[in-house]
Amino acid sequence: MSDPLRLRRAEATEPGVRALIAAQLAHGAEAAPETNDYTYGVAALSAPQVTIWALADSDTVAAIGALCDLGDGMAEVKSVHVAAAYRGQGLARRLMQHLHEAARAAGHRALVLETGSEALPGYDAARALYRGLGYGPCGVLPGYRDDPASAFFRLELA
């Protein structure tokens, strides 16, 4: 790593971002049933209602996360993923805290997200992170199925 990681806006088509999207898609394919994989690919993350942030140095994108504006004061957290070489350094928490700030600045009153349920151990760290940040369980989100492999969370923004 040549310099400290900085948070910046990113595009889904950037090579480093694309690499993390591919890694997240591979994780979803391995950790979740095919019928329960809601991971966004490059096209979905390029939609106008989606904003992506990256933690990166001049050479490497270490982590990504996105907000999808759902309207009515709500946004969905999407595609939070940390490259394997950077895990265990608190980058997901740092990125999530930035997403909270960005959502507040955009006028959102709440954030929602979907992740794998307790039935999918590959998502244990994600659930622990979200709970630790104050997210609580909520009902099924629009566009999702009621599925025992999904866990839905909501955070009211102050």
Where are these regions (language model features)?
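Conserved active-site alpha-helix within GNAT-family acetyltransferase domains
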Residues: 93, 118-140, 146-148
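Acetyl-CoA-dependent GNAT
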Residues: 3-74, 78, 83, 96-97, ...
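Conserved GNAT acetyl-CoA-binding A-motif
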Residues: 103-118
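Accessory recognition modules or surfaces
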Residues: 89, 104, 122-129, 149-158
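Short strand-loop junctions, especially beta-strand C-caps/beta-turns
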Residues: 80, 85, 114-118
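A generic structural signal for beta-strand entry/edge sites
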Residues: 72-74, 110, 150
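Short linear capping/connector segments at secondary-structure termini
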Residues: 37-40, 114-118, 147
